């Protein structure tokens, strides 16, 4: 297991513990369709679920169909399926199933079912953080192979800007005549700017390695434009177009500069009726602008099912293809399947 993941794990646990109850002001009001009126704190609304924190009960999840109305005097970012974004507070209206949103001089009445996202723009650093982490391992005596995988991400959100750090690693050790070690590792730091509910500009910097492909390291930057084709409370689908610049080092020491086009798509499907289930898929095609005939394909599939509050089981698959690997002994393809246990925090 890489020491980087252990450091990431400890930092994430520290963040999640530190933000649990600090600065929490439970002054928001939720009107439930069953007639209950609940007082607590709006944590966020996403993927058809309102995360509402209450004293003694912790954070409950309420589906959008169960919300009659909602009141919060916090400064919020509210996105709707009609390609509108509002900034301000949220208040009840004269009609159930509708809310009043915006600032004092610019307010609209919208339907709760039209809301895609509510995100508090908190003044406190810790309350802007959310993320997850997972870890898995398996051993096969038949071929003397040990595999360990770990991943995690931390997100930080402001009014129109967002930042994300992601880490992934897949390591395997197999004892034959000698100990064979293969590894795939990714560090990714990205930032995005919200142009509208459907359009975002994204900048990414990262480092990746894959010994199976003969790649010791790839340092890269990407500038891209992202558009959401589908954005509902049950699924999202987007496509990305961009340009990447990178420096590669092979396992034999060869260095190479590259410029690539980036065409990608991401899809999320989610169901939040116990147990919570989410499925994520991404794929990217990267034609090389410098080396004629070279192109790469990168894809991943991630499924998670909740076992109890904030903890989940995960299954992950990745597949990578490089038509002309930089390493002389590199393979053109690499893929893996891994399972693990994870924890998420908001």
Predicted regions and their residues:
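Outer-membrane pore/translocation modules
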Residues: 81, 111, 118, 123-130, ...
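Repeated loop/turn-to-beta-strand initiation elements of outer-membrane beta-barrel proteins
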Residues: 159-165, 198-201, 232-237, 270-279, ...
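Transmembrane beta-barrel strands of outer-membrane/channel proteins
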Residues: 133-139, 152, 165-171, 191, ...
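Transmembrane beta-barrel domains of outer membrane proteins
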Residues: 153-157, 190-192, 226-228, 264-270, ...
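Outer-membrane beta-barrel "beta-signal"
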Residues: 333-346
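Compositionally biased alpha-helical segments
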Residues: 23-157, 164-168, 186
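Sequence/structural signature of outer-membrane beta-barrel proteins
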Residues: 136-142, 157, 170-176, 206-214, ...
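Bacterial N-terminal signal peptides
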Residues: 7-16
């Amino acid at each position: 297991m890489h020491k980087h993941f252990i450091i990431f794990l400890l930092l994430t646990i520290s963040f999640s513990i530190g933000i649990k109850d600090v600065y929490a002001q439970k002054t928001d009001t939720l009107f439930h369709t069953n007639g209950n009126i609940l007082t607590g704190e709006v944590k966020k609304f996403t993927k058809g679920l309102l995360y509402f924190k209450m004293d003694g009960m912790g954070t409950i999840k309420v589906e959008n169909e169960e919300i009659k109305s909602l009141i919060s005097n916090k400064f919020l970012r509210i996105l709707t399926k009609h390609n509108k974004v509002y900034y301000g507070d949220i208040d009840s209206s004269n009609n159930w199933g509708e809310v009043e949103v915006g600032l004092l001089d610019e307010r609209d009445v919208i339907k709760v079912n039209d809301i895609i996202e509510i995100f508090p723009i908190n003044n406190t650093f810790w309350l802007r953080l959310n993320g997850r982490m997972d870890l898995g391992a398996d051993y096969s005596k038949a071929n003397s192979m040990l595999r360990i995988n770990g991943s995690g991400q931390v997100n930080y959100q402001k009014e129109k800007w967002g930042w994300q750090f992601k880490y992934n690693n897949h390591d395997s050790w197999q004892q034959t005549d000698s100990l064979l070690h293969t590894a795939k590792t990714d560090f990714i730091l990205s930032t995005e700017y919200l142009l509208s509910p459907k359009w975002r500009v994204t900048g990414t910097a990262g480092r990746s390695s894959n010994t199976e492909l003969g790649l010791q390291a790839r340092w890269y930057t990407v500038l891209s434009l992202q558009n959401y084709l589908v954005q509902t409370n049950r699924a999202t689908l987007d496509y990305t177009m961009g340009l990447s610049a990178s420096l590669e080092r092979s396992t034999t020491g060869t260095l190479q500069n590259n410029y690539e086009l980036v065409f990608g798509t991401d899809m999320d499907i989610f169901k939040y009726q116990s147990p919570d289930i989410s499925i994520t898929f991404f794929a990217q095609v990267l034609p090389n602008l410098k080396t004629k005939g070279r192109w790469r394909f990168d894809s991943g599939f991630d499924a998670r099912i909740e076992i109890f509050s904030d903890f989940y089981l995960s299954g992950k698959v990745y597949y990578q293809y490089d038509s002309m690997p930089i390493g002389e002994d590199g393979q053109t393809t690499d893929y893996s399947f891994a399972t693990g246990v994870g924890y998420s925090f908001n």
